[in-house]
């Protein structure tokens, strides 16, 4: 059985890399939204549990040869288990399922949707978009704009921002943002490659992050706040880029290769810069919850230290689900709401870093 959760609910750049010497203003990479609410979030949790011990058992030989200890994934990343789809399940079907339940929770019909954005990193082919398959499966009208936003692990928050802007402009009334991920093939390929001869510790650690990935799906409905007084206001947010680090994490279905040390360093420098720049537009120092992209203990602790927020206000789900890419933030948000840890009136921060490097931050008022 599938398990469901539904809730209503720069680094400093050299001068020659700067794109604009003028101060950042709302409406560019900093935005405020006037009349947009998050109406629902729904998630689909994959059936099959794969523990870190299961993966390491399949890598026992190479771990022994490289003199790396068993228990490394849980000790270093904090990931105890992750989910994979069972036989006959696909990430696209899961995304459709989450989308249907998100619409039902929001109280809207497929014909009401004016925009569908898919943010999946996983894709079975280069074209057409994953969005067209989801558009068809969800029974959306021909008038519903549909496309993919691919921006590594930030795609879902980016899509919420794009959708919010289109709602504020009056172009659409309701938007459905969806994401489905399947980590199975990339992990199988990674395990096979690491078990081949000639791999050293550097090779192993460059593919370590692939072993922490998980499968899952999520969807959210956004709509006009004035028509939904019970919705959760999307206040606004910021995005910033440090694309000089574009090659620190490069992935495909064959594998994901990461310079983890430099990615963390560059990512946290960008987070600090974006956080400091956001202070003139937002007061995020004392939010009720900080829902971050889910990667590892190391990443979460670094983010908390970088922006100086209380660790007990930062929920984590990577221990159970691993890194589910763009679905991680909505999965964690839904988990917090379902557990009663986000309540009416709470101020909620969404944020993360995506390979490339980009960061996105957003404020919700529950």
Predicted regions span which residues?
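Condensing-enzyme catalytic core mediating Claisen C-C bond formation in acyl metabolism
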Residues: 4, 8-88, 196-265, 269, ...
């Amino acid at each position: 059985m599938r398990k469901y959760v539904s809730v209503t609910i720069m680094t400093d750049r050299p001068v020659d890399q700067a794109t604009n010497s003028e101060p950042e203003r709302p409406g560019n990479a900093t935005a405020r939204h006037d009349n947009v609410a998050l109406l629902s979030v729904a998630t689909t949790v994959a059936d099959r549990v794969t523990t870190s011990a299961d993966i390491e058992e399949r890598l026992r030989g190479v771990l022994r040869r490289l003199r790396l200890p068993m228990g490394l994934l849980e000790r270093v990343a904090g990931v105890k288990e992750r989910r994979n789809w069972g036989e006959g399940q696909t990430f696209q079907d899961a995304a459709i399922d989450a989308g249907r339940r998100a619409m039902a929770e929001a109280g809207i019909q497929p014909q009401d949707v004016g925009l569908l954005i898919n943010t999946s990193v996983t894709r079975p082919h280069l074209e057409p978009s994953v969005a067209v398959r989801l558009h068809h499966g969800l029974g959306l009208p021909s008038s519903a704009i549909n496309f993919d936003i691919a921006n590594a692990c930030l795609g879902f928050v980016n899509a919420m921002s794009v959708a919010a802007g289109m709602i504020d402009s009056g172009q659409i009334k309701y938007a459905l943002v969806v994401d489905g991920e399947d980590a199975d093939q990339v992990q199988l390929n990674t395990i096979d490659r690491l078990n081949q001869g000639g791999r050293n510790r550097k090779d192993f650690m460059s593919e370590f992050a692939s072993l922490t990935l998980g499968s899952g799906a999520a969807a959210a409905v956004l709509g006009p706040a004035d028509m939904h007084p019970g919705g959760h206001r999307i206040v606004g947010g910021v995005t910033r880029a440090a694309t000089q680090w574009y090659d620190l994490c490069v992935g495909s279905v064959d594998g994901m290769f990461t310079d983890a040390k430099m990615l963390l360093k560059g990512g946290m420098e960008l987070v600090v810069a974006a956080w400091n720049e956001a202070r003139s537009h937002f007061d995020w120092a004392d939010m009720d919850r900080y829902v971050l992209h889910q990667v590892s203990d190391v990443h979460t602790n670094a983010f908390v230290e970088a922006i100086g927020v209380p660790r007990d206000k930062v929920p984590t789900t990577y221990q159970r689900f691993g890194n589910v890419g763009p679905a991680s933030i909505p999965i964690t948000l839904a988990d917090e709401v379902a557990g009663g840890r986000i309540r009416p009136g709470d101020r909620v921060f969404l944020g993360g870093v995506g390979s490339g490097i980009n960061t996105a931050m957003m404020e919700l008022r529950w």
